[in-house]
Amino acid sequence: MKKQFLSFTLLLALSTWIAQAATVRGTVSDTAGKPLQGVVVTDGYNFTQTNERGEYSLDSNLDKSRFVYLSVPGNYEIEQTKGIPDLFYQQLDKSKEINEHDFTLTPRKQPIDGFVYLAISDPQTIDERQMKRFREETIPDLKQTIERYQGKEVYGMALGDITWDRMDLFTPYKEAVSVLGIPMFSVIGNHCLLYTSPSPRDRT
């Protein structure tokens, strides 16, 4: 009897520890409130999937992880604002012991069987003159390419070094790609960092 009680106590303590270790948690559901199972969620270091109740939890190191985000399943929309994908990530607050973040996904009206991936390598604009060229030369060229794939979903991605150490050029860049009519993702490059920041965490 004593062994059974001890085993139960250890199991209870372990369950409590696991719950406390989950520094980031939340739910993923659709716009009708239906829980979504099997959605991949990550903090950039750890990965998990939602359970049958749409719940996820991550034991995140908040000194390293700045965001929690998910991989949007193919039968749900990629939400965007003026061409910049959003709503698939949320910022973490390292001052809180527990971060709770819920996600809501919009089901597609029609299923798709594929998409076109448009990659742009290193725009690396260093001043307003180069940004003007990006806007007046690169953007029209991209629009022509996109028009060739009418009827298909097109997703763009800038593969880092969007500017050349010029943080003030990100806003003109976002304005430029907003006219493409497609979700435009961006990857950070070594020239997309604010090196004057004393904290490595705040350089991105």
Language model features: what each stretch is:
Residues Y195-T204:
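Single conserved hydrophobic/aromatic residue that forms the stacking wall/gate
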Residues E79-T171:
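N-terminal active-site segment of His-dependent metallophosphoesterases
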Residues Y45-D59:
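Short, acidic Ser/Thr/Gly-rich low-complexity loop/linker segments typical of extracellular
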Residues D43, D63-Q91:
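A short, solvent-exposed loop/turn motif at the edges and junctions
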Residues M1-L6:
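Bacterial N-terminal signal peptides that target proteins for export
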Residues A22-V24, D30-Y45:
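Short, ordered, surface-exposed loop/turn motifs in non-cytosolic proteins
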Residues F8-T16:
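Bacterial N-terminal signal peptides
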Residues V24-D30, G54, F103, T196:
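A short, amphipathic beta-strand motif
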